Amino acid sequence: LQWLPQTSKNRRSALFVLGGSVRFLVWGECAAPAIYNEDSVERLMREWTEIIARDFSHPSIVTWVPINESWGVPKISFDRTQQHFSQAMYHFLHALDKTRLVISNDGWAMTETDICAIHNYAHGQKEETEKYDYFKETLRTRENLIKRLSTPWPIFANGFSYQEQPILLTEFGGIGFDVSGQPGWGYTSVDNEVEFLKDYQRVLSAVYASVGLWGYCYTQLTDVEQEINGLLTYDRQPKVDLAAIKAINDQFHVSQVE
């Protein structure tokens, strides 16, 4: 399973139409509020009502993600009020749309959720072998994915626990590679195409060594304003030979299917 979250501004996008025509799976997200208060709660509930009314008929959308990485709910790990809001959004979206999955807080500190969605960028530079070994170990089994943390935050918020949901690595990679002089950053960095492809294969090797993961989403398809970790530049030009990327993907994926 591979898919692409639709992030940033919510607008009717050709991505949804394209996804439907090429059988590409898309997750519906929206921009997060800067802070948590009653106004942000009301605004987000209203915006999600509009989002689902607008995008419900797109078959490419398979999951709704109202919260990502605790943005807008910074105390969700321990604050019961913010946890209530996360749970309310989970049930609210299910009430509006019974056909799709809902993730309560993509990345970590989840409450009620249909997918256990984990973010892990802790693979390190190629020379950081101990860091890479730990990264690989955190992914190796279902138990490790839940208990061996790669961030300061727990996978589930206080009072909540893993309930046998499918576990997906919904953000990883983030290999920074600048080919256009755009300022920005990545979680790790390389200097040329050869290094990028080697690092891409190194990271995917750890992912496919896991016996606990059900799927993944690589970060990310394109560079954005402040990040240079895309497979494509900001103006959608390939940074590396895309046939080489496909060959690496097929090297793992086809063997698993067969």
Residue ranges and their predicted role:
Residues 60-64, 84, 91, 112, ...:
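Substrate-binding clefts and catalytic carboxylate motifs of secreted carbohydrate-active enzymes
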Residues 1-127, 160-164, 195-196:
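Active-site mouth of glycoside hydrolases
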